[in-house]
C-alpha cells in the first residue's frame, strides 16, 4: 500500500486566524476611536503614570527610522506582509501546537494591524503612553501589545520545549 503525505487540515488554521482577526479588529477600532476623539498630540491623563495621546509613528518600534525620508513606510509594509506569509505557513504546519500557534496568531494580528495603518494612513497610530517621573516609554498601540505578548509567549514556549527535551 502506498504511503500518502497528509496535508494539514485547513480547519487547524482557522482558529488561529480567528484570533488574529480579533486582534486586528480591536486594534483598528481602538485607533478609529482615538482618531475621532483626539487631536494630534493631545494628551488625556488617566492616572499619574498613564495617558492616552494621539501620535503618529512613521518608523518601527520605539520610533526607529521615523525620521527617514519615507521609504520606511513601504519597507515595513513589505516586512509585515512577508512575516504574514511565514506565520501562515508555520500555523498550517504546527497548528496543533497550541501555545506556539497562539503566539504566532498574536504576532500576526499585531503585524497586520500596523500594516493596515501604514497602507491607509502612511504611518502607525500610537496612543498608549506610560510615564513615571522622568522616565517615558514611547507611545504604542494594541497591535504592538499583541506582538510583544506573542513574542514573550514564543520565547516561553521555546524554553519549555528545550527543558522538556532534556
UniProtKB/Swiss-Prot annotation:
Residue ranges of the TM segments: 9-29, 45-65, 71-91, 100-120, 135-155
Superkingdom: Bacteria
Single biological process term from Gene Ontology: proteolysis
Gene Ontology cellular-component annotations: plasma membrane
EC numbers: 3.4.23.36
Entry's family note: Belongs to the peptidase A8 family.
Entry's localization field: Cell inner membrane
Entry's Gene Ontology molecular function annotations: aspartic-type endopeptidase activity
Organism ancestry: Bacteria, Pseudomonadati, Pseudomonadota, Betaproteobacteria, Burkholderiales
Active site: 126, 144
Pathway as given in its UniProt record: Protein modification; lipoprotein biosynthesis (signal peptide cleavage)
Keyword field contains Ion transport: no
Entry protein name: Lipoprotein signal peptidase
Alphabetical list of InterPro entries matching this protein: Peptidase_A8
This protein's record includes keyword Cytoplasm: no
NCBIfam families the record matches: lspA
Keywords attached to this entry: Aspartyl protease, Cell inner membrane, Cell membrane, Hydrolase, Membrane, Protease, Transmembrane, Transmembrane helix
Role of this protein: This protein specifically catalyzes the removal of signal peptides from prolipoproteins.
Catalysed reactions, semicolon-separated: Release of signal peptides from bacterial membrane prolipoproteins. Hydrolyzes -Xaa-Yaa-Zaa-|-(S,diacylglyceryl)Cys-, in which Xaa is hydrophobic (preferably Leu), and Yaa (Ala or Ser) and Zaa (Gly or Ala) have small, neutral side chains
Top-level enzyme category: hydrolase
Annotated membrane topology: Multi-pass membrane protein
Amino acid at each position: 500500500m502506498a504511503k500518502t503525505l497528509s496535508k494539514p487540515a485547513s480547519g487547524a488554521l482557522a482558529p488561529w486566524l480567528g484570533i488574529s482577526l480579533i486582534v486586528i479588529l480591536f486594534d483598528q477600532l481602538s485607533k478609529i476611536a482615538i482618531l475621532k476623539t483626539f487631536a494630534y498630540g493631545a494628551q488625556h491623563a488617566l492616572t499619574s503614570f498613564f495617558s492616552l495621546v494621539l501620535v503618529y509613528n512613521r518608523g518601527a518600534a520605539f520610533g526607529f527610522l521615523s525620521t527617514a525620508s519615507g521609504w520606511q513606510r513601504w519597507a515595513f509594509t513589505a516586512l509585515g506582509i512577508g512575516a504574514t506569509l511565514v506565520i501562515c505557513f508555520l500555523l498550517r504546519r504546527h497548528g496543533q501546537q497550541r501555545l506556539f500557534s497562539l503566539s504566532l496568531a498574536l504576532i500576526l494580528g499585531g503585524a497586520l494591524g500596523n500594516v493596515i495603518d501604514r497602507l491607509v494612513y502612511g504611518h502607525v497610530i500610537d496612543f498608549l503612553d506610560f510615564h513615571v517621573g522622568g522616565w517615558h516609554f514611547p507611545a504604542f498601540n494594541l497591535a504592538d501589545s499583541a506582538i510583544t505578548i506573542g513574542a514573550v509567549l514564543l520565547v516561553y514556549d521555546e524554553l519549555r520545549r528545550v527543558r522538556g527535551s532534556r
